[in-house]
Amino acid sequence: MSSFQSTAAVRACARRAASTTSAATLASTTCRAAASRIQLQGQRSAGLVPKSWTRFSSSSIANDNQQKMLASHLQTADPVMYDIIEKEKQRQKQFINLIPSENFTSQAVLDALGSPMQNKYSEGYPGARYYGGNEFIDASERLCQDRALETFGLDPKEWGVNVQALSGAPANLYVYSALMDTHDRLMGLDLPHGGHLSHGYQTPTKKISFISKYFETLPYRLDEKTGYIDYNKLEELAITYRPKIIVAGASAYSRLIDYARLREICDKVNAYLMADMAHISGLVAAKVMPGPFTHADIVTTTSHKSLRGPRGAMIFFRRGVRRTNKKGEEELYNLETPINASVFPGHQGGPHNHTIAALAVALKQAQTPEFRAYQSQVLANATALAARLGEPKDKNGLGYTIVSGGTDNHLVLIDLKPQGIDGSRVERVLELVGVAANKNTVPGDKSALTPGGLRIGTPAMTTRGFTEEDFARVADIIDRAVTIAVRINKAAKEDAVKKGNEKAANRVKTFMDYLGNGETDPEIVQLRSEVESWVGTYPCPWDQSS
């Protein structure tokens, strides 16, 4: 196209844009760009705009194409990824999600996560950034901090909070690094007894978590007879070990934690009490179960589990007087500066501003009566689930062994060893019938690869509307899946022996290979059909068709 033809086309497009009131035409990227160029040409002719400010027509066309690409929605821009996401949305809708660490966040949180807040770099903290243009980023982060303190009923004179940590495990590392030197001592609940990797897990032969490489770690454990934390043994170990930090928190412990008892132990050994409430923060925010703030020095939490926010984290730290020493002098906390410095610049660069904005939205929602009612239902559902699974068969139960005998929070831990099956095999059968759960170690387990337990929880499906009656039905589905797993495990072993492969008969891989995708097993096919037709009728926050 000649320069004359190009100019004529531009002017014609501009005239059409000026002569019509059609919203669609006025919204046309090409016409708006053409009108803008005509206006700039007129201004340049009048000497109002320097020549260097205007765009050449060739570069304008290239830029228009780029803007068209940038303005395209996902379905147009990347159909392959769009298809994957749509399939995942369908899976979430058709699955019963029993994973205690998962939830369905709100549409408002998703809106904030997909907002232009993600475009901004903002190393530093509000009022002290290393980049310009952070006026509204600062406002967002300050709002998030204020809401975090409000949500948990904390006095800003006594508590501060950092909302920049990217997730829970890094947040824990940032606290350890702020308060300890390398090879200082840390105690946390042992992973096979319900703890978390980030509390310093190691085996006798390998340091699994790098935290156990950076610091010296010693686990405390449950009383295996009761399934409760053995606080007396913990105290004995702490007095001998003299840790710098004791972590109060878990990923698979269904009972209340005695924070007051842990405070006493920490005071005896001059240790910080750090509470990791990642799993229960939503319940604590709603005040349906006791929180750690009365007794802890530091509290960490993720924001996407029971709190039902985006995938982020918060670190709460004490301010003011820590204690009075033997001389009668007040000793102040020195946590805020070291922890903030550990987050940035110690471990992170720029924070994820879209996540912080989304977290602020979730915290606002966590202050509502609807959220408190939701958390009360989470507890009621967990109690009903544990009762149906754990009560004897002659008392309308299914007779399973529940670790600790029940639950005080959102999760239930089943010991499957009495059924002669492990969590790995049952998890796979559940997945094939449309139930997401996870294998988990239980006290007495020797291997984390074939743990004897199954961890299940109620937050996600309570979000979708499940009640106690629904979770009683969920228990029955789990029971049917366990029965299927036991049957298939027996058949897989017999098949391996028949083929002369006795050594492989007990391997999980042998079971998985024999099971396949379950399409040839009538019981699996039938149960999957029942689950999909039932759970698909419950809404998902992002699914307008629900």
UniProtKB/Swiss-Prot annotation:
The modification N6-(pyridoxal phosphate)lysine is found at residue 305. Homotetramer. HAMAP family: SHMT (MF_00051). In eukaryotes there are two forms of the enzymes: a cytosolic one and a mitochondrial one. This is Putative serine hydroxymethyltransferase, mitochondrial. Its EC number is 2.1.2.1. Gene3D superfamilies: Aspartate Aminotransferase, domain 1, Type I PLP-dependent aspartate aminotransferase-like (Major domain). It comes from Neurospora crassa (strain ATCC 24698 / 74-OR23-1A / CBS 708.71 / DSM 1257 / FGSC 987). Keywords: Mitochondrion, One-carbon metabolism, Pyridoxal phosphate, Transferase, Transit peptide. Belongs to the SHMT family. It comes from the Eukaryota. Interconversion of serine and glycine. Residues 1-64 form a transit peptide. It is an enzyme of class 2 (transferase). Pathway: One-carbon metabolism; tetrahydrofolate interconversion. It is found in: Mitochondrion. The keyword Lyase does not apply. It catalyses: (6R)-5,10-methylene-5,6,7,8-tetrahydrofolate + glycine + H2O = (6S)-5,6,7,8-tetrahydrofolate + L-serine. InterPro entries: PyrdxlP-dep_Trfase (IPR015424), PyrdxlP-dep_Trfase_major (IPR015421), PyrdxlP-dep_Trfase_small (IPR015422), Ser_HO-MeTrfase (IPR001085), Ser_HO-MeTrfase-like (IPR049943), Ser_HO-MeTrfase_PLP_BS (IPR019798), SHMT-like_dom (IPR039429). GO terms for biological process: glycine biosynthetic process from serine; tetrahydrofolate interconversion; tetrahydrofolate metabolic process. One of its GO terms (cellular component) is mitochondrion. Its cofactor is pyridoxal 5'-phosphate. One of its GO terms (molecular function) is glycine hydroxymethyltransferase activity.
